[in-house]
Amino acid sequence: VFCRFNGQQCTSDGQCCYGKCRTAFMGKICM
């Protein structure tokens, strides 16, 4: 499995390298 960096869109399970998956105006991104 790979994780998403901050500023990238979250995967369906919301796995982020750092921070958390949050809903933004452009969809769900890692912050």
Curated annotation (Swiss-Prot):
GO cellular component: extracellular region
Upper taxonomic lineage: Eukaryota, Metazoa, Ecdysozoa, Arthropoda, Chelicerata
Function, in words: Acts as a neurotoxin.
Keyword Membrane found: no
Organism: Phoneutria nigriventer
GO molecular-function term, one example from the UniProt record: toxin activity
Domain of life: Eukaryota
Name under which the protein is recorded: U13-ctenitoxin-Pn1b
Family, similarity comment: Belongs to the neurotoxin 17 (21C2) family.
